[in-house]
């Protein structure tokens, strides 16, 4: 069973995450940050990972802690659900077009966290959501999920489209990487003998 449940509690946030890598993309995400919920829904739908998030944070300050801590918890849940990573494809990449936006994501479930982020936004906010929090989410996801992640904006004029294309591109790359590879059943996808 490639499932996980994580609870993270700090003085700033209380987060619960449940995910199923072998899902159908079902989602039920409630963080108190509307645009972020919309992005998490995209992440689930397009990765085919079932995802449920419940978050309560210090939104009276801003959205930062809620977004970052949700990324931490989802990353931890991914690590738990993947186990020793035997039999997975490990790598994934995708170019995602959404209207004016074109974003490329490539990732390696290597247990070596590293984020390369080449995504600029033409606006600092999408509604009330700070666009810089998109990077914060993926930094937390990469670090706590042990993911080498590259995300590049190739084109884009609209901040909402760019952010959504980034989440969808990462989702499609993740879908590929977590997929069981029948030719590698029970085999670790590394010559090192460990990931």
Curated annotation (Swiss-Prot):
GO molecular function, one term: imidazoleglycerol-phosphate dehydratase activity
BP-aspect Gene Ontology terms: L-histidine biosynthetic process
PROSITE patterns on file: IGP_DEHYDRATASE_1 (PS00954), IGP_DEHYDRATASE_2 (PS00955)
Coiled-coil ranges (or none): none
Keyword entries, A-Z: Amino-acid biosynthesis, Cytoplasm, Histidine biosynthesis, Lyase
Keyword Ion transport: no
GO cellular component terms listed in the entry, alphabetical order: cytoplasm
Residues annotated as transmembrane: none
Protein's cellular compartments: Cytoplasm
Similarity-based family: Belongs to the imidazoleglycerol-phosphate dehydratase family.
HAMAP family (alphabetical): HisB
The protein, known as: Imidazoleglycerol-phosphate dehydratase
